[in-house]
Amino acid sequence: MPKYQSSSNNKGRKILIGTALVTFAIIIITFFSGSLTPTKDLQGVISSLPNDKLLGLSNFLSSENSKNQDELLNKIEKLNKKLFQAQDAKINKLEEQNKLILQELKLLKSPPTSASIRDKLTYLYPYDSESKFPAYIWQSWKHGLNDERFDEKFRQGESQWAFKNPGFVHELFNDDTAHTVIKYLYQQVPEVIEAYELLPETIMKMDFFKYLILYAKGGVYADIDTYPLQPIPNWTPENVSPLDIGMIIAIESDSSSPDWRKEQIRRLQFAQFVIQAKPGHPILREAIAQIVEQTSVKKLESLASSGGGPLKLIGNTNEKSLKISQWTGSAIWTDVVFKYFNDYIQSSVFQKVTWKEFHKLQTPKLVSDILVLPVKSFASDVEEPKDGKIEDPLAFVKHYAAKIWKSG
């Protein structure tokens, strides 16, 4: 049956084409000779044809015309689509260029020279609490990835940060590139650059760098001796909106020992080996300002006592560790966080916040816009199973706690 229908259709099509050709021939002959019929014009020739032939011819011509129109419309539609895509691409490119230009102009604008270090930092990178966490992961280490001195354990952690967070920009800086980035981002605040260059230990420069890169760019900073167990978006509890959070930190130590002062500066300390923050956050600004001020004081003390020269840490290993903690590490970081909590203008917290608020913390706690995680979240002792399924939902990062500053 289908073959019969196809043959019949083809036959009818041939008849219509033949009719059209005959009609055309009659018109031509009539026009040039006038000998076949007395009809003198085209209208007369057509009117002399039988009605059934005229109907078939009309249908055929209408069908062909409709087909041609459809093809033309399809071509126009494809052309329009191409033009719109090209236009969208140009607009996106222009928007990116405008952003870069605005960033460059912002860096070229100098804050007033008479302004305080805090005012200069605020001027350069103001805080927008309603912004999103930028999708950046920052790390630093004294050796590059291609250096044979790059520890294999650190290399595995570095690769896992990228693997577990495919939508994030992941950058690893060495000593030279970190220095270059700081000089670029803080060219309008020379006090910051000078303080960075004066710091006497590699680990102190790493500490300072993490605050500086997070303050300017936001995102996540992770020390090189960390290993991610879960993707970064898992850090935020389901019942908390990321827009309500300006920073995510964890507790580093929560001592109940009466001799805790021998090992650390504060009884409870916040970790700074992993931090997630929005750019321009006031806690980061205060940490940077205090480090700059401390370094400036130590520079003056060095000039007064020995006529200048490079700054140095004096003492045994434990004494040096405590001094580093007070200068750039966990102790100063903890003090700055508590200062923020207890400044109700900044934090909108109207009651005094002490270490007791976080003592033996087992679940995430939101204070102001700071999400504080328990010790196990960023210093988990969980080993990642082969199937990748972590039993403890709050185990986010392993921290090897390597004393990397010793080889500074």
Task: Pin down the residues of each PLM region.
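Glycosyltransferase-associated regions of secretory-pathway enzymes
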Residues: P2-M206, A222-G408
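Small-residue hinge/turn detector
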Residues: D207-G219
